[in-house]
Amino acid sequence: MKKGIHPNYVPCKVTCVTSGKEFEVLSTKPELRIDISSFCHPFYTGSDKVVDTAGRVEKFKQKYNMK
């Protein structure tokens, strides 16, 4: 690796806005705020959230009188 061209890595405090949990990683920035993390994402927590896409399709069909 060339010297003097790579950014410096510092300990970074990452805060999940949704769950309020904090953890530390290495990054080029000292602090990050994220919307979702492994503490609150349904894939990692095991909780299922159903997204109602059928409702949106039905609204579209009603709006344009489609069957």
From Swiss-Prot:
Does the record carry RNA-binding as a key word? yes
Keywords, A to Z, come to: Ribonucleoprotein, Ribosomal protein, RNA-binding, rRNA-binding
**Under the cellular component aspect of Gene Ontology, which terms does the record hold?**
ribonucleoprotein complex; ribosome
* A GO molecular-function descriptor: structural constituent of ribosome
Q: Which GO terms describe its biological process?
A: translation
Matching InterPro entries:
Ribosomal_bL28/bL31-like_sf (IPR034704), Ribosomal_bL31 (IPR002150), Ribosomal_bL31_A (IPR027491), Ribosomal_bL31_sf (IPR042105)
SUPFAM superfamilies membership: L28p-like
Q: Please name the NCBIfam families in this protein's record.
A: L31 (TIGR00105), PRK00019.1 (NF000612), PRK00528.1 (NF001809)
Q: Which PANTHER family match?
A: 50S RIBOSOMAL PROTEIN L31, CHLOROPLASTIC, LARGE RIBOSOMAL SUBUNIT PROTEIN BL31A
Q: Which family does it belong to?
A: Belongs to the bacterial ribosomal protein bL31 family. Type A subfamily.
How does this chain assemble?
Part of the 50S ribosomal subunit.
**Reported function:** Binds the 23S rRNA.
Query: Would you tell me the protein name for this molecule?
Result: Large ribosomal subunit protein bL31
Record organism:
Wolinella succinogenes (strain ATCC 29543 / DSM 1740 / CCUG 13145 / JCM 31913 / LMG 7466 / NCTC 11488 / FDC 602W) (Vibrio succinogenes)
From which lineage does this chain's organism come?
Answer: Bacteria, Pseudomonadati, Campylobacterota, Epsilonproteobacteria, Campylobacterales
